[in-house]
A protein has these predicted regions:
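Solvent-exposed loop/turn and edge beta-strand elements of beta-rich ligand-binding domains
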Residues: 1-230
Length: 230
């Protein structure tokens, strides 16, 4: 006797079912031995599940230009960056990259949404890499966890069926569209960062300058008030 391994690869299309609705894939192998008159048949099936995220980008003062906002998505489970292609306003994952420079840059659409489909049940980090001028960049990456649990068996082949759940930064998220999409919102606030590129001395000099300006303003106001009283 001998063992033969047959491998094949399949690609999920944009029409793939998402969430708890699986994509069944059945394989039937038929072969005949040279010393027999009958055929042997082997059947196997698998159920593929796929998920997505819907990021809503907002500015706290309803200002800001969404086109200046950029995100990067990292698969923490496999330690790779997500590569995706955009079609009709939706990003579809098509592969992974080991280097950060090769990762896809995700930009919100006109309504502020970034929809990414074709993700596995893994742990992801969503990092904001750029935002509009005069707004504070998101400090920490958003941690997204998509996990599955057994929910039964396929009556036809006995394969385990799955149901999904998700958390965002450790808090339970209510998935939409039959546990297909993880919704989350990222908000930027107006603000500025003091320059620190010159080192500790330069930063302290900047802070000191601001303090001196405040003192000068106080002195001017106090002086004017004193003169008006005279």
């Amino acid at each position: 006797d001998c063992t033969m391994r047959i491998s094949y690869a399949a690609t999920l299309t944009a029409d793939a079912k998402m969430g708890d609705t699986d994509n069944p894939n059945e394989v039937v192998l038929t072969w005949k031995r040279t010393n027999t008159t009958y055929f042997d048949t082997l059947k196997d099936c698998c159920h593929v599940y796929t998920y997505g995220i819907d990021v809503l980008k907002q500015f706290s003062d309803s200002g800001g230009n969404l086109r200046n906002v950029k995100f990067r998505l990292h698969n923490d489970t496999d330690d790779v960056f997500v590569i995706a292609e955009q079609k009709d306003g939706v990003y579809y994952a098509k592969g992974f990259a080991a280097k950060k420079s090769d990762a896809t840059t995700f930009v919100p659409n006109s309504s502020g949404h970034i929809v990414v489909k074709g993700l596995e049940d893994d742990t992801y980090s969503l990092t904001e890499t750029a935002t509009d001028k005069s707004y504070v960049l998101l400090k920490d990456a958003v941690k997204i966890v998509i996990k599955t649990a057994e929910s039964g068996q396929c009556e036809k082949c006995g394969t385990k069926l799955l149901t999904a759940s998700a958390t965002v930064n450790g808090k339970d998220a209510t998935m939409t569209d039959g546990n297909a999409i993880v919704p989350l919102t990222v908000v930027n606030n107006p603000g500025f960062d003091l320059p620190k590129t010159g080192g500790y001395g330069t930063w302290m000099f900047t802070v000191g300058g601001v303090a001196l300006l405040g003192a000068a303003a106080f002195i001017v106001v106090k002086s004017r008030k004193h003169k008006s009283e005279q």
